Curated annotation (Swiss-Prot):
Transmembrane segments: none annotated. The gene is rpsD. Keywords: Ribonucleoprotein, Ribosomal protein, RNA-binding, rRNA-binding. PROSITE patterns: RIBOSOMAL_S4, S4. Residues 94-154 form the S4 RNA-binding domain. InterPro entries: Ribosomal_uS4, Ribosomal_uS4_bac-type, Ribosomal_uS4_CS, Ribosomal_uS4_N, S4_RNA-bd, S4_RNA-bd_sf. GO terms for biological process: ribosomal small subunit biogenesis; translation. Belongs to the universal ribosomal protein uS4 family. SUPFAM superfamilies: Alpha-L RNA-binding motif. It comes from the Bacteria. One of its GO terms (cellular component) is small ribosomal subunit. This is Small ribosomal subunit protein uS4.
Length: 205
């Protein structure tokens, strides 16, 4: 198990927020960060601190991306026309692991990354094992036939609610999803407030 994967339960505590809206999040039990000194009095945060925090939240939400992965995504967002903050969110939501998570084929974004990396997913009928693969509008994402009876998938599908994001269409029984358009920030169902505009300020400073 990677260090980034094993540290997922510390992300909520470090941020002081329940990033994924999980009932068992440690933030639900206490409102301070990890470590024995986590309960110190809060100090006023600088503009840079707010920007850094916004970046760490967004990185953490998508499976604790590495700085290299995240900065490359930001650079691509900055090169594109339009609002860089909106572009950044659109690119993150276009990741294959993000779409697998949004389609509720697996319970967490961490599980989605592992699921893709282990070759359980196809895009337009071809197996893709790169979690950061950038899906295009019209792409059809599906769970491979031989992977459909995995306990992870069956439990996720059985326990998930049937409401899905408006930018994907999902055939829950067929374990298939179509990426119909790149979302705007306001459409992404983040359980907590994300501030990609502060991320833009972080990289611009």
């Amino acid at each position: 198990m990677s260090k980034r994967h094993s540290a997922k339960y510390k992300i909520d505590r470090r941020m002081g927020e329940n990033l994924w809206g999980r009932p068992k999040s440690p933030v639900n039990q206490r409102s301070y960060g990890p470590g024995q000194h986590g309960q110190r009095r809060k100090q006023k945060v600088s503009d840079f601190g707010l920007q850094l925090r916004a970046k760490q939240k967004l990185k953490g939400y998508y499976g604790n991306l590495t700085e290299k992965q995240f900065s490359r995504t930001y650079e691509e967002a900055a090169r594109r026309k339009g609002n860089t903050a909106e572009n950044l969110v659109g690119l993150l939501e276009s990741r294959l692991d993000a779409i697998v998570y949004r389609a509720k084929f697996v319970p967490t974004v961490f599980a989605a990354r592992q699921f893709v990396n282990h070759g359980h997913v196809t895009v337009n009928g071809k197996r893709v094992n790169i979690a950061s693969y950038r899906c295009k509008i019209g792409d059809v994402i599906a769970v491979r036939e031989k992977s459909r009876n995995m306990a992870l998938v069956l439990e996720a599908v059985a326990s998930s609610e049937r409401d899905f994001c408006e930018y994907i269409t999902v055939d829950a029984k067929g374990l298939e999803a179509s990426f119909i358009r790149v979302p705007e920030l306001s459409e992404v169902p983040y359980p907590v407030k994300m501030e990609p505009n502060l991320v833009v300020e972080f990289y611009a400073s």
